[in-house]
Amino acid sequence: MSYESPGTRLRRLWAQLSPLPGGKWIFSKLLGLMVPYTGRLGPTVLHFEPGHVRAQLTERRSVRNHLRSVHAMALANVGELATGLAVLGAMPSTVRGILTGYSITYTKKARGVLIAESKCAIPEVTDS
């Protein structure tokens, strides 16, 4: 039995679905099943390649706070989704990654259609 890393599986799924009509939406829904907390927010992955992801979150009642703007944790969560997917997609198939921390700064209220974009380079992984 061979092991397929989550990043490899997601890249393969993206390659199969993204060219199809509605494929990005289907990929995003399947990703939401794999990551249920994030899936409840309903983000859509717009672009996915190793080290680069763009995800969209559309403002609606279920992601708003009492100030009638997108909740801060919804913003952080879609940012984490984009970052995690970019990192997972760039990692070698023999490696698994775990987020150990992140920091976010909020500069103003978020409203409307929001885009989270992550670009990263993964250093070479060695056994030592």
Go through each PLM region and give its residues:
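Terminal targeting signals and extreme-terminal segments of soluble enzymes
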Residues: 1-128
